[in-house]
Curated annotation (Swiss-Prot):
Residues 455-508 are annotated as: Disordered. It is found in: Cell membrane; Basolateral cell membrane. It is a multi-pass membrane protein. InterPro entries: Bestrophin, Bestrophin-like. Keywords: Calcium, Cell membrane, Chloride, Chloride channel, Ion channel, Ion transport, Membrane, Metal-binding, Transmembrane, Transmembrane helix, Transport. Residues 1-31, 83-238, 289-508 are cytoplasmic. Ligand-gated anion channel that allows the movement of anions across cell membranes when activated by calcium (Ca2+). Transports a large specter of anions, namely mediates the movement of chloride, L-glutamate and iodide. Calcium-binding triggers the dilation of the aperture, but calcium-dependent gating is only effective when the size of the passing anion is bigger than the closed aperture. Mediates the calcium-activated hydrogencarbonate movement and participates in colonic hydrogencarbonate secretion concomitant with mucin secretion. Ca(2+) binds at A10, Q293, N296, D301, D304. Residues 461-478, 488-497 have a biased composition (Pro residues). Pentamer. Interacts with GLUL; this interaction tethers a fraction of GLUL to the membrane, causing a decrease of cytosolic glutamine synthase (GS) activity and inhibits the chloride channel activity of BEST2 by affecting the gating at the aperture in the absence of intracellular glutamate. This is Bestrophin-2. Belongs to the anion channel-forming bestrophin (TC 1.A.46) family. Calcium-sensitive chloride channel subfamily.
């Protein structure tokens, strides 16, 4: 039922989409031709009545009605309402497809974790996958009309081989008025636990992996049920439908061609068929038809999901994976590129031109810079001493006017001047410093009057430390203290577990 045209648009070429306009199955023409003919018929009937049936006075009144409808029909926000609605429907449609229960991951885990080449192991694997397929069939026949027509009763499910008669009895004996698509998943988990107890599943990690994948499969079945149960709010669908239909009902009257002799504005041309009004109806009504077809993809429209095909494919593939393909491996051989330093698959003559194209290295790989632009530069503010940078930072933290008043501000200024002088002396650029002969302060030739030794703040002398007390006469203490080592512990009672590491412990 799905219309596939992917191969037709594999390459972009002149008129690539034009050939798709000639397709009939799944086309907009197939969906809309009845509504389009109905709209055109009503339009032509009103036009004929205006031209041939109405009296002159009635024609004047009809012309006023045409002008009124044409003026106020644009107040209906058709594009706005349709745009949001169709976006919501398409998003919902794709999410429903992503919730289709596919057994591919589950069958790989079953084939890798449930072991045994005998009939018992084979029975476990086939039954597990049959339960998964049964759960998918039960949920799809609940939401898809095509699947329900194929399996209208549980008897048809039993005859198709998805359920045994004993399982049907257990299924029908469950006292529940709700949908029981989840019952085969419970059977699956119980059978997997039984296989673990028998050793078919060798560890709990494998059982955990199997049940986690089963929960993913079951959650997809549950989401299909909820998508079928919770629809797009009816009021939204009604608003969109009423907006589109009322707009074109107004267009039936407002887009009529009037008598040019009356001199109405924008009515200087008299035609029989409204070409652009029909195109507008085709686009807007076709937009609504898109939402109408995609809102439930589990029907029997041309573009609905191939649910019966998926049931057949999933059942056959899952049985092949866990039965005939189980532990069936080809002999291990060295590949063609075993001794090759660089493995490269060959190209045909039709694709040999791809070898001439360079591999992508990154968007900045081919950027070229001038030689002078590639030289590292020292950052401004880092060349100075670290103390100067810290001093500037502390100065910014002080309140306004506090940098020059008080001992802290004077010390920060003095520290900044000292660092500046030492930095200039080390580079020998413009300042020469020499120590005084009498051991006084440093003389700098920087020309800064603030560096005069007489203006410096006197340094505080450290307080005199008291002399240490005289030693007390007495015996000289030993340099080390002797500590007695305890003997080995007594053996513990036999009913107590031995502490960790006691076997390696030896008496000191």
């Amino acid at each position: 039922m799905t219309v596939t045209y992917t191969a037709r648009v594999a390459n972009a070429r002149f008129g690539g989409f034009s050939q798709l306009l000639l397709l009939w199955r799944g086309s907009i023409y197939k969906l809309l031709w009845r509504e389009l003919l109905c709209f055109l018929g009503l339009y032509m009937a009103l036009s004929a009545a205006y031209r041939f049936l109405l009296a002159e006075e009635q024609k004047r009144y009809f012309e006023k009605l045409v002008i009124y409808c044409d003026q106020y029909a644009s107040l209906i926000p058709v594009s706005f309402v349709l745009g949001f609605y169709v976006t919501l429907v398409v998003h919902r449609w794709w999410n429903q497809y992503l919730c289709m229960p596919l057994p591919d991951a589950l069958m790989c885990i079953v084939a890798g974790t449930v072991h045994g080449r005998d009939d018992r192991g084979r029975l476990y694997r086939r039954t597990l996958m049959r339960y998964a397929g049964l759960s998918a069939v039960l949920i799809l026949r609940s939401v898809s009309t095509a699947v329900f027509k194929r399996f209208p009763t549980i008897d048809h499910v039993v005859e198709a081989g998805f359920m045994t008669r004993e399982e049907r009895k257990k299924f029908e004996n469950l006292n529940s008025s709700y949908n029981k698509y989840w019952v085969p998943c419970v059977w699956f988990s119980s059978l997997a636990a039984q296989a673990r107890r028998e050793g078919r599943i060798r560890d709990n990690s494998a059982l955990k992996l199997l049940l986690e994948e089963l929960n993913v499969f079951r959650s997809k079945c549950g989401m299909l049920f909820h998508y079928d149960w919770i629809s797009i709010p009816l009021v939204y669908t009604q608003v969109v439908t009423i907006a589109v239909y009322s707009y074109f009902l107004a267009c039936l009257i407002g887009r009529q061609f009037l008598d040019p002799a009356q001199g109405y504005k924008d009515h200087t041309l008299d035609l029989c068929v409204p070409i652009f009004t029909l195109l507008q109806f085709f686009f807007y009504a076709g937009w609504l038809k898109v939402a109408e077809q995609l809102i439930n993809p589990f029907g029997e429209d041309d573009d609905d999901f191939e649910t019966n095909f998926l049931i057949d494919r999933n059942f056959q593939v899952s049985m092949l994976a866990v039965d005939e393909m189980y532990d069936d491996l080809a002999m291990l051989e060295k590949d063609l590129y075993w001794d090759a330093a660089e493995a490269r698959a060959p190209y045909t003559a039709a694709t040999a031109f791809l070898l001439q194209q360079p591999s992508f290295q990154g968007s900045t790989f081919d950027i070229a810079l001038a030689k002078e632009d590639m030289q590292f530069q020292r950052l401004d503010g880092v060349d100075g001493p670290l103390g100067e940078v810290h001093g500037d930072f502390l100065q910014r933290l002080l309140p306004a006017g506090a940098g020059s008043v008080g001992p802290l501000g004077r010390r920060l200024s003095l520290l900044r001047r000292k660092n500046s002088c030492v930095s200039e002396a080390s580079t020998a650029a413009s300042c020469g410093c020499a120590g005084a002969a009498d051991g006084g302060g440093v003389e700098c030739g920087c020309g800064d009057p603030l560096l005069d030794p007489s203006l410096r703040e006197p340094e505080l002398e450290p307080p005199a430390c008291p002399e240490p007390p005289a030693p007390i006469p007495g015996p000289t203490p030993e340099p080390f203290t002797t500590v007695s080592i305890p003997g080995p512990r007594a053996p513990a009672p036999p009913w107590l577990p031995s502490p960790i590491g006691e076997e390696e412990e030896s008496p000191a």
